[in-house]
Structure formats: structure tokens, C-alpha cells
Amino acid sequence: MKIIADENMPYVQELFGDLGIIETVNGRSLTAEMVKDADVLLVRSVTQVDASLLSKNSQLTFVGSATIGTDHIDTEYLTQRQISFSNAPGCNATAVGEFAFIAMLELANRFGTSLKDKVVGIVGAGNTGSAVARCLQAYGVEVLLHDPLIEKSDPRNFVSLDELITRANVISLHVPITKSGEHKTWYLFDESRLNSLNADTWLLNCCRGEVVDNRALINVKQQRADIKVVLDVWEGEPNPMRELIPYVEFATPHIAGYSLEGKARGTYMLYQKLMQVLGKKEEKEMLALLPSFWTEQLTLTKEPSEKALLQLSRFVYDLRDDDALFRATLLEDPSKKAPVNSSNNNGFDLMRKNHKHRREFSALTLATTGQSEVDWLLNLGYSGVGR
């Protein structure tokens, strides 16, 4: 069996090595010729899997995408070809949720305010949006949800987008990209909607770059410095508008979901599905893949303040590091930029490929004196806290 896998997908050798010959490739430059003799194809969101890519292959049995979304996969075509397909919904939801929560803590610290006093509107209440909500609700922050696709079948309370924008002073975006239809998300936040944001609103985009009109965002930010922005995703990736970067408080290269746990979970979910397709018993465990955290545990002597919670979060992931690297790579240091016309696209893809794979809150064990008032840290995701 020949397995072709994206070179940036972790633990492929550990999980699939016993099943056949593995060839790793650059997902952006994959061609029909390169996959013509593949039995299994493992990709990420940077690879379009369609009739064109598979035109020379007559033996493919399984396509796996270590992603939440499937907009890069022609699933109808795979069904016609009777090629099994699986993605990994929710694999990085915890990572995205914690990323957004940490970004909000960083904004609160930078601008001398309290996250706990904010009203956070979450646009898109699927896996990642719900993960953000869990973090915020564990900390005691008021959360508003907007998701017209699931509100009729979901018992949670939802509000309209207009109401959310009116009431919220933090907005976090977690929707798939949809270019047409009643609930189109392409340029969901256009210039008009951006201008309608409350004074001092924080806007975070951790889903798809084109959900926010980036050119319009520049125009609005030039007039409204009160709006604070966190962008992990960019219109036109992997070539973001460099002129937008100075207007963004925290800028990262589409790595919100890049926790070690999340990336391992995505690959592992594909391993589980392929074993089902092959009719084989699973022989690998995901937790066995993960290294030990750098410290066994930290001891809390009292309930942490918001500043202490930020410091605790920085033990697991310091967002400032990725922000500084992003700016240095795309704006400042020519030595960090890839050659013109290279597949690394001036460093954006290179940053993703070389990301240090942060850990999730669960990797850090907290010891306490047993006080029940820190139980909320367990709900936030840390291990070993509370009663």
C-alpha cells in the first residue's frame, strides 16, 4: 500500500508506518502525477482534492483530511468514485478555543481592562465556537451565540447577528466559508458591518480569512483605532495584505488549531477511520504519541487573578512569540523570508511548517490546597485542579 501524506501532518509514520510505504509531500504543490499510484491520500486544508488531482489515479481507496472543514474536498466526486473519505471534525477545537481565550486575556492585559467584564459574541457555535464558549463560561464571562445553521436543533440560546453586534464588545468568528446562499459568510464582516461595531470592540478571526473583508478592515482601522483586532487567518493566504499587519494587535499565520494535542488528534482520527475501512483493529493509542510536558505540575496557593491566569496561560502558550515572529518574517527581517516564487510564499507557510506545536491547557497539572473555588480551572481545561 502506498500512502501519500502532507509533510506537515504529524505522527504519520508512527500511526501509518506499519500499513505501507509512506511518501510525504508539499500539500500546496501536489499534482495528479504525484498521486497517480497512491492507495491512501492524507491531506490538510491547503490541498484541493478533486477530479483534476485524481485524474491519473485509478486505485485510490481512502482520502483523509486532518481538518474540520471539507471545502477543499470534492466529496461528491469521491462518492462517485467510491473512495472512502474522512475528515477530523473537532480535532483542533480545544486548541482554537484556548487560542481565542488566551488572545482575549492578552488584549485585556495590554489595554488595561478586564475580560470578565466583557460580553463576548461568538459567531458560529460549532466545535470551535463552542470550545471558546466553554473557556469563557468557565471563567464567568457572559457569552452570546449566533449560528442560524444549528439554532433550531440546538437547546442553547441564540441571538441574531445584529443583536450580537449591538450587545457584544468582543466578537469571535468561528464559521466555515460559504460563498452563496441565505447564510453566506464570505465577507460577512464587510465595511458596513465593521463600521457598525461598538466603540472599543475586539474582533477575533480564527476561522477563514475571507469572512472579514481585509481591505475594508484596513479602511475602518485607519478611522477607528478603538477597534482591536486579532487575526489568525487572512484573506489571500498564504499572501496576506502586509499593509494590514500594523493595524492588527495580534497576528499569527493560521495556527490557532496548532496544538500538539490537536494535530495528533487529527491524524489519529484518520488512522481510526482507515483501520475501519481496512477492517483492521486499532493497535495505536494517541496519548502514547505525546511527549511529557516541560514541568510536572505547578502549585496554586490561592485563586488566580486575571493577570495570574494570563501568566498561567503563558506557561502553556505565549501568543506574543508567534506575533513577534509573524511581524519579523513578513515585515522586518529579509533573512527570514523565503525566495520569490518559492512554495513557502515569503515565510507564511514556513512559519506554519516550523510552528513549535504549543500544548493545550490539559498538559499542565495544577496542584492546589484543595479549595473548591478553583474548580473552574478544571472546566477551563487544566489538569489536576479542584477537589
UniProtKB/Swiss-Prot annotation:
Binding residues for substrate: S45, T67, Y258
GO MF annotation: an example: NAD binding
InterPro entries xref list: D-iso_2-hydroxyacid_DH_PdxB, D-isomer_2_OHA_DH_cat_dom, D-isomer_DH_CS, D-isomer_DH_NAD-bd, Erythronate-4-P_DHase, Erythronate-4-P_DHase_dimer, NAD(P)-bd_dom_sf, PdxB_dimer_sf
One term under GO cellular component: cytoplasm
Catalytic EC class: oxidoreductase
Domain of life: Bacteria
Record's subcellular location: Cytoplasm
UniProt record, GO biological process: pyridoxine biosynthetic process
Catalysed reactions, semicolon-separated: 4-phospho-D-erythronate + NAD(+) = (R)-3-hydroxy-2-oxo-4-phosphooxybutanoate + NADH + H(+)
Active site: R208, E237, H254 (proton donor)
PROSITE patterns given in the database record: D_2_HYDROXYACID_DH_3
Pathway membership, UniProt: Cofactor biosynthesis; pyridoxine 5'-phosphate biosynthesis; pyridoxine 5'-phosphate from D-erythrose 4-phosphate: step 2/5
Record EC number: 1.1.1.290
UniProt entry keywords in alphabetical sequence: Cytoplasm, NAD, Oxidoreductase, Pyridoxine biosynthesis
Pfam families with a match to the protein in the record: 2-Hacid_dh, 2-Hacid_dh_C, DUF3410
Residues bound to NAD(+): D147, D232, G257
Function (record text): Catalyzes the oxidation of erythronate-4-phosphate to 3-hydroxy-2-oxo-4-phosphonooxybutanoate.
UniProt subunit comment: Homodimer.
Family designation: Belongs to the D-isomer specific 2-hydroxyacid dehydrogenase family. PdxB subfamily.
Full protein name: Erythronate-4-phosphate dehydrogenase
Native organism: Shewanella woodyi (strain ATCC 51908 / MS32)
Gene name per UniProt: pdxB
